[in-house]
């Protein structure tokens, strides 16, 4: 899919109001990733992906050393060490079996993957050493690949995005020029 950034941002601002530069940068990165990703062929599904990122990054995060909310950038889950560890340490369902795994494998990215199992799984599928270096999930291209693969293949919930938002022939081709 191809997007006209000027048109996109004009419509975005009409619907949602002004954007900070860090938000423009984040959305621009997402638009570029979406254009380069042949997996997304539906504007409606892509809209859902963008909305998910908006929700997942709206809790705030640090971008270029500055705390911001609604970042549209890959972020590290916010929370104190104590909070994160109380929620993730020792969680067998996440594969957090080693001391410190709760903190090491806390949420990161556009969709906040958590747990040793998820970092290992996505790292293997993408050919990226996520289990060895979880901060790689903060790179926009890796964060997008996790989001795309997870949604389209059903790796987050067991259901594919098309189970929720089905693809219809010719519907979206009329929406994208």
Show where each model-derived region lies.
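Acidic helix/loop microenvironments that form the catalytic cleft of cell-wall polysaccharide enzymes
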Residues: 53-57, 162-177
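Ordered core of a single globular domain
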Residues: 29-35
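Short polybasic/polar patches that bind polyanions
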Residues: 35-36, 124
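Extracellular/periplasmic catalytic domains that process cell-envelope and extracellular macromolecules
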Residues: 4, 40-45, 103-106, 139, ...
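A residue-level signal for beta-strand positions that form part of recognition/binding surfaces
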Residues: 110, 158, 175
